[in-house]
Amino acid sequence: MALNLFDRGAPFDEEELANRYRHILSPEDRDRLPAYAALCDALAESRTALELLGAVQARQQNPTLILAILHYLALTGHLVLGPLYGELHEGHPVTPEAFARSVIEVLEAEPALLRRQLWRSTQTNEPNRSAVLAAAIGDVARTLGHSQITLIDVGTSMGFNLFPDHVTVLDRDQGDDAALVTECFTPGFVRSPVPFIGRRVGLDQNLLHPTKTDDVAWLTACLWPEESRRLRRFTALLEQMKQWPEPVRVAGNAVDLIDYEVTFDDTPTYVINSWVLAYFSLEERAQWRNTMDYHFAEREDLVWISMEHPSINDTLRFPEAPKNVPRPGASEIVVTSSFYPSIHWGWSHPHGHWFSVDSGPKA
């Protein structure tokens, strides 16, 4: 236990925070992103980086926040970080350890720059997850006979995942920057179309809007700079979003808002969440599950599709995840509906690069 100079001497667990830096990337992503992997390792060894993370409110003590702030400083003109990250954006080869050392030098020399941004929250809501969510929504809607739905996205950020019916999904990159690319590991799986979405609702405590310059800069910063394709996709989808229907955006705690939204009308309602429930306290997760169970009992056409790390799902009274994880660090997709108990549907890369389908509600 150490004292945090950035938080009035509040104690923090150095080893716990160091391990968060070391393990924030999955083994698969560490192989794909050598510069970011080296940076995460260097952050774990930096006393200043530990103190900065320790100064963040508990539910946001995620190393992705520090990574995003560094990227944000680069995007907004920092004289040293800008060129460093620019090399990654352009896909130029860099020496991972040298990149990490240079970034750490800035962090330790100018910690106040990062300190001023600790109020922010990481809200990526990766658009490529829509490629997987679209498969799950289509499969469940086909099984349950739903031709029109309301879609509610919990932790919506900028709202990309409210449009699974508007995106192009491919199984390999064909040069279309706006297309989502995901590989299905399940032989013979055939996608069913996403039903007509009549109402789209995004819930988030910190809504981001595609027309606000700083919101766009911050969400760009939440992406990983070595993924040039992902950055191009974000820009292309922002442009396409101008032509999409304007969703309903509601700011606030989803636990407080969900009652109204799932009873808005009698259209079959699908609630989705992806990598957001980790930011709920244990008490909030229990309250969320109880609230959803109440509405499952009250109406016949409510569906909840959850895409989270299995350790989060364990706190939601979901069945124990099967052991057939295709790759370490995968997210588990669990489907719950008014007619069926929570059931394991499949696995996915956290950013939707691949997915597998194991089961689903059976009519």
Residue ranges of predicted features:
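Short, hydrophobic/aromatic alpha-helical segments in well-folded domains
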Residues: 132, 136-139, 218, 275-276, ...
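Short His-Asn-centered micro-motif
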Residues: 129, 154, 250-253, 272-274, ...
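Phosphate/oxyanion-binding active-site loops and adjacent basic polyanion-contact surfaces
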Residues: 122-133, 227-230, 250-255, 284
